[in-house]
Amino acid sequence: MAESEDRSLRIVLVGKTGSGKSATANTILGEEIFDSRIAAQAVTKNCQKASREWQGRDLLVVDTPGLFDTKESLDTTCKEISRCIISSCPGPHAIVLVLLLGRYTEEEQKTVALIKAVFGKSAMKHMVILFTRKEELEGQSFHDFIADADVGLKSIVKECGNRCCAFSNSKKTSKAEKESQVQELVELIEKMVQCNEGAYFSDDIYKDTEERLKQREEVLRKIYTDQLNEEIKLVEEDKHKSEEEKEKEIKLLKLKYDEKIKNIREEAERNIFKDVFNRIWKMLSEIWHRFLSKCKFYSS
């Protein structure tokens, strides 16, 4: 774990294909940013992120594809886990397991097992369960729904410290009700963070990735600064241009430099992707066959 010093709240959504992760992300973000159509196949193919300002906090939401879609390979899974790690650095405050109202399926059990295998069981201290299709409770209280749930579902709820809530992402649900749901989720996460001594989730993978990102940002910043100084020098030494032309060109060069610096984090993320992928691949390739057969090996 690592202490959180800023006002950001990093939220990673995980769960099986079709559980409503993208629709939930849109509800949290307060607008339709991610494609959340009802489809037979996964709509979200790649890990994606977006953020919003909310009551003085910056909510960063990372939407992941179904990590255990049976059609996907180890290679694809490693790529998406790598993207998730990079997108949520230096570490998520909450790993939100998105489930449809109903039973706790094998694919969802495998997703939790995968999280434990990659990040360790301590990741469960940062997990919240979010049920979608709240409107289908049809008068039944959420408390009663949990009380009547099967053993598997009760077990994962207990393992997550009974941190759970329900969302209705339906277009029929009012904006005010959706914002109330976001309020409930954020309060649940903030309470969890307090229980974790103000810390977000972090481990060796996240720490190493964040360090690589910072180092790469420094290298890129120096490269761009040196390039800018060299280009400015060439402009200043150009005897065929007036002072007014030089000033205008230098101004444009600085604007171009500022744009590069603004996007330096994203470029650093692209640069280190292969290193993170190789680490995840090495870790999972040794145990992948076990996930494809018995997830219980990791769920215990």
From Swiss-Prot:
Chief localisation class:
other
What is the organism of origin for this protein? Answer: Homo sapiens (Human)
Q: Which CDD domains match?
A: AIG1
Family membership: Belongs to the TRAFAC class TrmE-Era-EngA-EngB-Septin-like GTPase superfamily. AIG1/Toc34/Toc159-like paraseptin GTPase family. IAN subfamily.
Q: List the expressing tissues.
A: Most abundantly expressed in spleen, lymph nodes, and fetal kidney, but also present in the heart and the small intestine. Lower expression levels are found in lung, kidney, liver, and thyroid, salivary, and mammary glands. Also detected in the thymus. Detected in T-cells.
Give the gene that encodes this protein.
GIMAP7
Q: Where is this region: G1?
A: 15-22
Keyword Transmembrane helix in record:
no
Name one molecular function that GO assigns to this entry.
Answer: protein homodimerization activity
Protein known as: GTPase IMAP family member 7
Q: How does it assemble?
A: Monomer in the presence of bound GDP and in the absence of bound nucleotide. Homodimer in the presence of bound GTP. Heterodimer with GIMAP2.
